[in-house]
From Swiss-Prot:
The active site is at K68. InterPro entries: Aldolase_TIM, OMPdecase, OMPdecase_AS, OMPdecase_bac, OMPdeCOase_dom, RibuloseP-bd_barrel. Pathway: Pyrimidine metabolism; UMP biosynthesis via de novo pathway; UMP from orotate: step 2/2. One of its GO terms (cellular component) is cytosol. Homodimer. This is Orotidine 5'-phosphate decarboxylase. GO terms for biological process: 'de novo' pyrimidine nucleobase biosynthetic process; 'de novo' UMP biosynthetic process. Catalyzes the decarboxylation of orotidine 5'-monophosphate (OMP) to uridine 5'-monophosphate (UMP). It catalyses: orotidine 5'-phosphate + H(+) = UMP + CO2. Belongs to the OMP decarboxylase family. Type 1 subfamily.
Length: 235
């Protein structure tokens, strides 16, 4: 499909995996109009991140709140209601069926897109077995993707390696957000299952999450432009 620069900007989510708000603000300023979507995880959420979320939204940026919620249904539902009021665009929760259903009900009427986390991209088969799961990462991701669709979730988070197969499971309407994206010729970091930007989009990803290759670059803006160019390449 033909994708223009603008929609690629909407599809690139920069992970603000930095120690404090000051560094996050610096990065957002550096990246300027090139980036319209940011991911905020635990690290920033617990260091003044909620105010920062509001600042980003006021600056007309979209926020992907990566909280990977998992608790009793009622507790998750109340959290989702409050997060929806913030004006956040995406929120992650672990893809457990009853939790997802409760969250979907709580987010009704808001613009919040709920994403089910299938399997963490840092986990391989041995890790899953150690954690007490019998399934392979692929099998578990399939099961959870199916359950996310049945619960009425907005999308799923999965490794780009499973994206093509999972896209068939969830259909074309749901978001498929893939972390573990590394531009051509870069280091894997701590993710065991990684893929290049264009390849991930061609595999069915709707959004790419990129953190380390941008935030650790000598020039984050140049790195971002390179990734956007890789995303557009071959459209």
């Amino acid at each position: 499909g033909v994708v223009d620069d603008n929609s690629n900007r909407e599809r690139l989510i920069v992970g603000l995996d930095v120690p404090n708000i000051k560094q996050a603000e610096k990065l957002v300023t550096q990246l300027g109009d090139e980036v319209s979507f940011y991911k905020i995880g635990y690290q920033l959420a617990f260091s003044g991140g909620m105010d920062f979320v509001q600042d980003l939204i006021q600056a007309r940026k979209k926020v992907f709140f990566d909280m990977k919620l998992l608790d009793i249904d009622h507790t998750v539902a109340r959290a989702v209601e409050n997060i929806a009021k913030l004006g956040v665009s995406m929120l992650t929760l672990h893809a457990y069926p009853t939790v997802m259903k409760a969250a979907v009900a709580a987010a009704k009427g808001s613009d919040l897109c709920l994403l089910g986390v299938t399997v963490l991209t840092s986990m391989d088969e041995a890790d899953l077995h150690n954690a007490g799961y019998k399934d392979s990462p692929k099998k578990l991701a399939f099961k959870r993707a199916e359950q996310a669709r049945e619960a009425g979730m907005g999308g799923i988070v999965s490794s780009a390696l499973e994206a093509a197969a999972l896209r068939k499971v969830i259909g074309s309407d749901m978001a498929l957000v893939t972390p573990g994206i590394r531009p051509m010729g870069s280091d894997k970091g701590d993710q065991k299952r990684v893929m290049a930007p264009r390849q991930a989009l061609d595999s069915g990803a709707s959004h790419l999450v990129v953190a380390r290759p941008i935030i650790q670059a000598d020039d984050p803006l140049v790195a971002t432009k390179k990734i956007l160019a890789e995303m557009a390449d071959g459209c």
